[in-house]
Regions:
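Predominantly late transmembrane helices and immediately cytosolic-facing juxtamembrane segments
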Residues: 1-112, 129-149
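Loop-to-transmembrane alpha-helix initiation sites
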Residues: 117-127
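Short, intrinsically disordered terminal tails adjacent to the first/last structured region
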Residues: 150-155
Length: 155
């Protein structure tokens, strides 16, 4: 369940409850970006049943590991695709550009964890940790004052 919270925090902290820029391309990007995002969240939820069923196994079943790990990677990637359609993407470049790179690295690491197929507990904990990296990065960046303040001129 904590993996689901990680996906939820990733989306709602960076893209959720925000409208796209008032441009046709941004609107289409925002709409279509939500399709793989919601599919990944649903798939992750379905795979959690198998993760719990195999909680005492020495390795996570391959299908379960891949669905959970790929789902987490898709959530990280598509959240940034959706975020790129927002006005904040342009207004807060100092936050969102490095955040997108951090999310991409975390997404690749999610796939690596899935390929390794550790025990179900380790898989779940690893995905929670990886989903928290972009959030932790953004919090640290904001606390350090490294994000572009509102109204920063565009380059």
């Amino acid at each position: 369940m904590v993996v689901g919270f990680g996906a939820w925090w990733t989306y709602f902290d960076f893209a959720g409850q925000r409208r796209p820029r008032p441009e046709p391309v941004s609107t289409v990007q925002w709409l279509l970006g939500h399709l793989p995002l919601t599919a990944a969240v649903a798939a992750m939820g379905a795979a959690m049943v198998s993760l719990v069923d195999h909680a005492h196994d020495g390795r996570t079943p391959a299908a379960t590991a891949w669905v959970l790990s790929a789902g987490a990677a898709v959530v990280l990637g598509t959240t940034m695709v959706v975020a790129a359609s927002l006005q904040a993407w342009q207004d807060k470049r100092g936050l969102y550009r490095p955040l997108a790179r951090t999310s991409a690295v975390a997404a690749v690491a999610c796939l690596g964890v899935g390929a390794a197929r550790p025990t179900p507990l380790v898989l779940g904990l690893a995905l929670v940790l990886l989903l928290s990296i972009p959030w932790g990065f953004a919090v640290a960046r904001r606390l350090a004052g490294g994000a572009d303040p509102p109204g920063t001129p565009q380059a």
